[in-house]
Amino acid sequence: MFKNEQNFSSYFLLSAILSISILQGELVFPGNGILINYIHVLFEWEQESEAEHYEIQISESSNFTSTVVQADKQTLVYIEKDALDWDKTYYWRIRPVNNNGISGTWTDSYSFSTGSPLSESNTTFSNPSDIQNGITVFGAFFNYFSAAIDQSGKEIWNSGSENIV
């Protein structure tokens, strides 16, 4: 198979590089540079070898000098429902932590932007004890959009530029 030692060395080095790049996890969602029309955001990443859990950071600055979210997760997903807002650009990254508590290196960061809210709805609660968990989805026929609000009346999703009612 190998005609000389140099071919074997080249093959071995290439195999090692490919193995390392395949084993290192990658950020999956939200994808780099995308615009989303919701502020309850699912973050997903690929598994990294020997990771017991992951640290995730979300920041408004690309150098992560301050973070809006810093969390530890034992899964490959994280849902942020409170800290993100409309009309902002965010950066996110993860790093694995092994069972000895040793942190790996941070992944390259991805950025994403949140669109603008479309609803001008206001919520008034006459009896706060009647509030139930969940979301309310509605359509606005005059402006041709759909949106969802959470139990506190905060818009968390909209149809963006799509005219769906």
Please report, for each region that a protein language model flagged, where it lies by residue:
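Short proline/glycine-enriched turn/loop motifs at strand-loop junctions of beta-rich domains
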Residues: 48-52, 141-143
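Histidine-/acidic-rich catalytic cores in large beta-rich domains
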Residues: 97-165
